[in-house]
Amino acid sequence: MERQNNDGGYTFCQYTDSSAEDTYFAVRTLKILGVEPKQKASTIKFLKSLQHKDGSFDSIKVAYYVVKTLNELGAKLEKSPKEFILSLKNPYGGFGSLNVDVEVSSEIESTYYSIEVLKSLNECINPNEIISFILSLKNFDGSFGKQGYSKIASTYYALASLNLLGYNTKSLNKTIEWIRKCESPRGGFNSNPYGFDTYMVIEDCYFGVKALEILDEVCKYPLQTLSLISKFQNGNGGFRRSIFLGISTLECTYYAVSTVKTILRKI
């Protein structure tokens, strides 16, 4: 609650402006913890203010965070962003660019966000073209990623998108095998099978556990993973990205809390 501003939005760094991203992660985390968000009316007003008059947003990420958080709070946008979302379609059948910055976790991320927003708005989606696009990014080892570059983030977003579109993800046996290779006996997941446990980050633990959940699988080392996640926690109660150093963020805290809840459900 310390990270909520007077406008109802949230920020991971006190005394800075609220953002859609931090507000989404804060509200989602509170829901997992069974805590009712404060100043709900102000939060809804803040989120709605992020939509432009023509229905668009600054990015698909902002649209996703706004729509999903409003859903959590029992509210809706005044104007549908459908046209904005459809304007992001790429020639390959997905959404957004395949050439993404290093800060973006996956080239499939925009497609996943777009599907989620359209489904949240009960808009009709033609799944076949999008499914073909996602499967075109499937590598020989079962992972997903452009030009054969496998990442657990891309594999998670691919599975989550396919699942939303009604594709039988449980038929992807090689994908399950690849994710298992990312799993460490000491707990957690690496970005790929060749990663080092030393450089493990909290979001890859989240992507690994959640990807297995989509496939009706569970992590092999739940207690070790829970122990590892505890090492990401700072003294202020929040979680950081690395086990070594870093400030707490609402995003990392959500990844940690959500991952823990998923694991505990299966034990």
Report each predicted region and the residues it spans.
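Long, well-ordered core segments of solenoidal/helical folds
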Residues: M1-G9, K38-G55, K76-G96, I125-G142, ...
